Amino acid sequence: MTFPDDGFWNSRTSLREIKDYAVSRLVSPDAVLAVTLCRIIAATPPHVVLPPTIGSDYGSLNFGVVILGNPGSGKDAAFGAAKALVPDIRDAPVTSVASGQAISALFGQRVQEDGRFRLECKSPRAMLRYSEASNFRALSSARESNLQPEVLSLFSGQQIGDYTKNRELSVTIPEHGYRAVVVISAQPSMMGMFEAGVGWASNSDSSTSPHTVTGSMSVPSTRKRSCFPH
């Protein structure tokens, strides 16, 4: 996605501040906006959903972006700029995972109590971050890997995790019981793996006159909710 029209960036104070900050840091405003949206969504409680306009299920706010750019073009810098704008994401872990099974383990774990295992919430939110798309492709291409389909399940807020005979390792997180965002940095040569998608955030910027702004953006404080509201 690209937003070359100044009318878009000037339509809201927050958008203008994002663009000004990105330009002052010599990074793409489009990429900074995309990651900023991810961070704001990560801080949003999982019980906040979209209305069921199609079918009977709610829509999820879970979100993912791909930052596209050549080596050294500032993909990581754009990620860092968004972090400076929205530093508080409610203690959400920011990490990559090597398998689909590990995703559910970010949100919950089985603990033994009185001889029985129960599911305990570790965190209601998480950000999956892959600084190189080649790493994500390698992990997804591994034999019997379910990483990619499990990541796709995140975007619609579906139940994640598998039920196994080993109750200690059986971690399933209910639908809309977690908040997840995904940020992947990719070089143009890697875009083939995302060709089924609808778009990506460009890391290029035509602006050439950097200027400095002050202040930061934050989201209102909210009470921490369980990742298993149902």
PLM regions: where:
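Phosphate-handling catalytic cores of nucleic-acid transaction enzymes
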Residues: 1-230
